[in-house]
UniProtKB/Swiss-Prot annotation:
PANTHER family: BINDING OXIDOREDUCTASE, PUTATIVE (AFU_ORTHOLOGUE AFUA_1G17690)-RELATED, FAD-BINDING PCMH-TYPE DOMAIN-CONTAINING PROTEIN
Family matches, as Gene3D superfamilies: 3.30.465.10, 3.40.462.20, Uridine Diphospho-n-acetylenolpyruvylglucosamine Reductase, domain 2
GO MF term list: FAD binding; oxidoreductase activity
Gene disruption: observed consequences: Only abolishes the production of pleosporalin A but not of the 2 other final products.
Upper lineage: Eukaryota, Fungi, Dikarya, Ascomycota, Pezizomycotina
Inducing stimuli: Expression is significantly up-regulated at the end of late growth phase, in the presence of Butyrolactone I. Expression is positively regulated by the pgm cluster-specific transcription factor pgmR.
Keyword Transferase: no
Role summary: FAD-linked oxidoreductase; part of the gene cluster that mediates the biosynthesis of pleosporalin A, ascomycone A, as well as a third cryptic naphthoquinone derived pigment, all responsible for the coloration of conidia. Essential for the production of pleosporalin A, but not the 2 other final products. The pathway begins with the biosynthesis of the cyclized heptaketide 3-acetonyl-1,6,8-trihydroxy-2-naphthaldehyde by the NR-PKS pgmA.
Name listed for the protein in its UniProt record: FAD-linked oxidoreductase pgmH
Swiss-Prot/TrEMBL keywords: FAD, Flavoprotein, Oxidoreductase
Domain FAD-binding PCMH-type: 54-215
Enzyme Commission number(s) of this protein: 1.1.1.-
SUPFAM superfamilies reported in the protein's UniProt record: FAD-binding/transporter-associated domain-like
Record Pfam families: FAD_binding_4
Amino acid sequence: MDPNIMWQARNDGSGLLEEDIQQLRSSIRGTVVLKNEASEEEYNAAVTRWNNVSIRLATLVVYVEDEQDIVKCVEFVNKHYLDVAVCSHGRHSYHGASSSTGMVIDLGRMRKVSVDKEAMTVTAQGGCIARDVELPLEAEGLAAVFGAVNETGVGFLTGAHGLAADNLVSARMVLANGQVVTASDDENSDLFWAIRGAGPNFGIVTEFKYRVHKQGPVFWQMLFYSPDKLKDCVSIVNQMHNISLAQKGGDFQVMMCYLTPPGYPDLHPGLRIFYNGPEEKAKELAAPAYALGPLSVSGGMCSFSDTTRIPPYLEFEGFDRYAASSAHLDYPLDEDLLLEVFTMFRNVIHKYGHHLLHPSKCILDLRNYEKVASVPIDATAYSGRFDVAWMIPDLQWDDPAMDSTMRMEVTSITAHIRERVREAKGDHVSGPRDATAIYPNISAGGEEKAKSVFGPNLPRLRVLKRKYDPNFIWNKWFPIVPA
């Protein structure tokens, strides 16, 4: 059956009777917020997201308290054939955690964490945010790799330890039929393979168990340069990446950004330096960046958890509407193309003036992905196992009337990059990837994008989708059509 027809056929919940809602409420410990019953304040709080573009007006939102609540919600969804979305904390630029019809299952109250220092693991419930896990780990001198865990999870420890998905030991899940299972190398190994990259297609994880690592203080510094040094910054990006690769432990990581820092009237290039070690060594490795003469320098030695906080130069009141896209670039990076892209981004910023100027940014991710690339492409569902750079234009604005325009502008930049990559490659494809491969955290949405994210693993995923979700209940993020 066509997936769009399968989704559209789902009930929006408007026909639910009062007795249906009462039955749901009496079966769970959590709270049901009903669109036409709750106060405006209560309902708005239930559907608000970090990205206001992602707000959808669901018929009901259920704040679950435990795993059994989730089971009852899934049973209710099946009984009434409702559309359903799952919200862990709602902090994502895409709207996969929202539903314009049916039910949202909100995991935000499920935030328990336990650390097993002897086994070097941490167990965290599905509603946890990064700091819920980072702080108890930090107290034990430990850390884990974190990122957008509904897909793969990339962080500044990825160079040393791989993706969050590569450090997943096991997961407890509620499947589409309401069954609770454990997925690991030893139990339901096919499901475990699938959720490491395609998790939103297969169920709701109530509990993750991750491998953790010993962790001390790190060096974390942001260098901003005057606008006229954009070309100089671009001229050292290949050198900085090569320095990162030379550190075999993956401890030295660099990112470039192009944004308007607080107190400045226009875009400035910047380099973010991370080193999992002492300041003296960090500055030695990053010498080319300091030699350019930064306009300002902030940061230094800090705890690892400090690196995951939103930095002051990205904190702005309002501007709570987001659009981001991504495209990969092969090394050695084409400096002329990078300057083209930064110029396109600057033109967009200047075109829309005060709507975009301060919070918007363009990021060039130069982090070392050799550890990620060392894992065979068929070892997990995620197929993006290669060491490339990622260009990520990210626009923020505050006027809802500009939503579609901003989405068009941001995707036009990455479309240009992909076209240039295609031109450079011609008909040649290196291994299992192609010129359209995308960064899943940024480019969620739609079956076509699923093909790019999962590549040669998609046929197997479609077979597993038929096994674990034949009725296409889980149809958000990167919806995989059952075989």
